[in-house]
C-alpha cells in the first residue's frame, strides 16, 4: 500500500476536507501500550507505520488511567470539558465513591456523535465493558466480549475471559468481521485491555507474543481497509510498583484525619491493579485542615508532590467539581489505595499506573490524506480531535 500521509502540512484545512467524506477512519487505542512495550516487541506493521507515517511519543493526560484518556481521545477534549477525572470519583451529592461508567457523566460530544452529524456510521469495540457503558453515544453499535450478544458469539466464537490476552484477539477478530461484512461503517474505534501489561513486563516473552499477535491483527485491518486512515495511540504505560499507601489510614494515625481518599485508578477490574494507582484525590473534613494534611502527606515515603485543587485544575486541566481538595502524586514506584493496614510492600510482579511516570505513549498516524501539522499532535487526545468538526478551530494548527 502506498502511504498517503503528508507530514509537511503547516496550516489547518477544513476539517471536512481533512477527513474526507469517503475516507474511513480506524482508531485503535492500545490500553497500557507504552513506548517500552513497543520497542521491546517484534511489531513489523507498526514499524512500517512509524517509517512511512507520522510517529511521535506524546503526553497522555492525568491521572494516567483509562477512563480519563479514553474519554479525551473519544471527545477530543480535556477533562475540564468532558468531566471524566478517573475510573472512580467521589459523588459529593450522595457522599459515596462511584465508578465512572455511565455516559451521562461525559459532558462533551463524542467523535461518534460528530461523525453521525456528518452522516458517518460508527462502531465501538472495547475489551472492557465499562468503555461501552461510558462512550456509546453516537455509535451504531458498541461491542464488548464481556457482554457479547449471541449474534457476535456465533460470528467470532465464545468470548475469552477478561483476564487474558486472548480477549484482545477476540476483539480484533470482531472488528475485522465488521470491516469485512459491513462496508457502510465509516468510523471504527477499537480499545483493548491492559491486563497483559499489568501481568507482564515489556521484556517478558508473554508480552512480546501478545503484542506480536496484536501487530498481525493490525496488518490484517490495514489489508481489509487499505484506503482508511489508521490512528493508533495509548492511554498510559504500565510499570512495576513496590509500595502502596492507604492515605486515609496514614493521615488518621498522624492526627490529621481526612474525609476520604479516592484512587482514580479504582475500577471493577480488581485483578489488574487491586485499585491502586499513582495518584489520589484527598477530600478534607474541613478546609482549615489543608495545610496540616498536606504536610502529613508530603512526609510519606514515595510521595512526589501534594498540590491543591486549584493547581491540579490549572496544571492537568481537570474539572474542579470532580476532584478532591488536594491531589497526591506518587513517585515512580509508589501507589495509593485501600488497604487493611496503612502501607504494604508490593510483590515484584505487581504493575500499575496512574502517575506522571506512565504518561508518555506512542502515537501513529498512517494514511491520512490531510492531517494537521505534526506539531499539533502534542497529546494523545488530539489524535482524532481534528476529525468531523463543523468549523476550523484555531487549535487545529497549533500545539498546546
Regions found by a protein language model. Name each.
Residues 1-6:
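Bacterial N-terminal signal peptides
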Residues 21-25:
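Extreme N-terminal starter segment of soluble prokaryotic enzymes
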Residues 33-34, 193, 200, 236-238:
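Catalytic metal-binding/acid-base residues of hydrolase active sites
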Residues 36-81, 123:
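Short, structured active-site-proximal loop/turn typified by the sulfatase FGly-forming signature C/S-X-P-X-R
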Amino acid at each position: 500500500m502506498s502511504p498517503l500521509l503528508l507530514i509537511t502540512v503547516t496550516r489547518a484545512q477544513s476539517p471536512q476536507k481533512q477527513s474526507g467524506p469517503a475516507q474511513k477512519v480506524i482508531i485503535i487505542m492500545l490500553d497500557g501500550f507504552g513506548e517500552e512495550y513497543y520497542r521491546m516487541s517484534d511489531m513489523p506493521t507498526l514499524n512500517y507505520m512509524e517509517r512511512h507515517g507520522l510517529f511521535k511519543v506524546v503526553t497522555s493526560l492525568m491521572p494516567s488511567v483509562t477512563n480519563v484518556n479514553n474519554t479525551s481521545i473519544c471527545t477530543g477534549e480535556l477533562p475540564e470539558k468532558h468531566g471524566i477525572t478517573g475510573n472512580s470519583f467521589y459523588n459529593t451529592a450522595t457522599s459515596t465513591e462511584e465508578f465512572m461508567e455511565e455516559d451521562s457523566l461525559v459532558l462533551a460530544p463524542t467523535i461518534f456523535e460528530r461523525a453521525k452529524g456528518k452522516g458517518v456510521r460508527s462502531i465501538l469495540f472495547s475489551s472492557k465493558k465499562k468503555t461501552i457503558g461510558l462512550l456509546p453515544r453516537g455509535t451504531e453499535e458498541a461491542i464488548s466480549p464481556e457482554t457479547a450478544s449471541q449474534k457476535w458469539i456465533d460470528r467470532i466464537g465464545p468470548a475469552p475471559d477478561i483476564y487474558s490476552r486472548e480477549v484482545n484477539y477476540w476483539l480484533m477478530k470482531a472488528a475485522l468481521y465488521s470491516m469485512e461484512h459491513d462496508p457502510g461503517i465509516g468510523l471504527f474505534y477499537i480499545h483493548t485491555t491492559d491486563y497483559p501489561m499489568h501481568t507482564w513486563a515489556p521484556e517478558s516473552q508473554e508480552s512480546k507474543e501478545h503484542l506480536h499477535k496484536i501487530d498481525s491483527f493490525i496488518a490484517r485491518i490495514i489489508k481489509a481497509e487499505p484506503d482508511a486512515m489508521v490512528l493508533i495511540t495509548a492511554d498510559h504505560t504500565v510499570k512495576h510498583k513496590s509500595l502502596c499507601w492507604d492515605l486515609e489510614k496514614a493521615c488518621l494515625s498522624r492526627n490529621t484525619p481526612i474525609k476520604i481518599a479516592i484512587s482514580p485508578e479504582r475500577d471493577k477490574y480488581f485483578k489488574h491493579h487491586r485499585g491502586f494507582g499513582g495518584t489520589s484525590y484527598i477530600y478534607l473534613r474541613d478546609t482549615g485542615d489543608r495545610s496540616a494534611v498536606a504536610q502529613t502527606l508530603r512526609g510519606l515515603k514515595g510521595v512526589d508532590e501534594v498540590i491543591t485543587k486549584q493547581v491540579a485544575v490549572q496544571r492537568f486541566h481537570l474539572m474542579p467539581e470532580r476532584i478532591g481538595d488536594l491531589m497526591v502524586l506518587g513517585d515512580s514506584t509508589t501507589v495509593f489505595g485501600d488497604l487493611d493496614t496503612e502501607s504494604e510492600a508490593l510483590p515484584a510482579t505487581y504493575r500499575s499506573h496512574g502517575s506522571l511516570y506512565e504518561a508518555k505513549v506512542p502515537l501513529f498516524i498512517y494514511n491520512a490524506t490531510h492531517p494537521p501539522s505534526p506539531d499539533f499532535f502534542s497529546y494523545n487526545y488530539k489524535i482524532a480531535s481534528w476529525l468531523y468538526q463543523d468549523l476550523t478551530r484555531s487549535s487545529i494548527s497549533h500545539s498546546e
